[in-house]
Amino acid sequence: MRGHPGGEENSRRMIALSGLAPGASILDLGAGAGETVALLRALGYEAGGIDLAPRGAHVKKGDLLRVQAESDGYDGLISQCAFYLSGDIPAAFREAYRLLRPGGVLMYTDVCFAPARPIAEAAGFEIRYYEDMSALWREYYIEALWRGTADCCGIKGRCGYEMLICGKD
């Protein structure tokens, strides 16, 4: 699982930090090939995902800015490297807030040019955990250059990478 910095280890860490118990309903926003969805399901969560170009089991076509789901419908959301790609980070946080039940948790990691914390707070979230993971982004980027799969040369050196665990109370 190398579709995002830190791979499966980072996904497991986010899940642990969320405090969500197995059986909770979790939607992966920007699920891609569904690797994180598969991990969540293996850990006992009721998990599915959406992506503009779905490529995995339990991943449906959908736009994270306009999710076809009821408000307050999920215990948890996870998004790794997807809000930035949506083109509208504030709208992505607002949509995530709408989707979560009261007491729900958003697990978020992404590239950032400015801190996401104030954007998440403006959407209504309480920040429960924050970590600057820019060193992990640099390692991931260098590895992608080495493999010849880096397609984001325009952003190198100008961005960071951060993790937020956000609650909806």
Model-inferred region functions:
Residues 65-77:
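A short acidic, Gly/Pro-enriched loop at the edge of an enzyme's catalytic core
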Residues 132-169:
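Conserved Class I S-adenosyl-L-methionine
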Residues 4-22:
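Conserved alpha-helix/loop element of class I SAM-dependent methyltransferases that forms part
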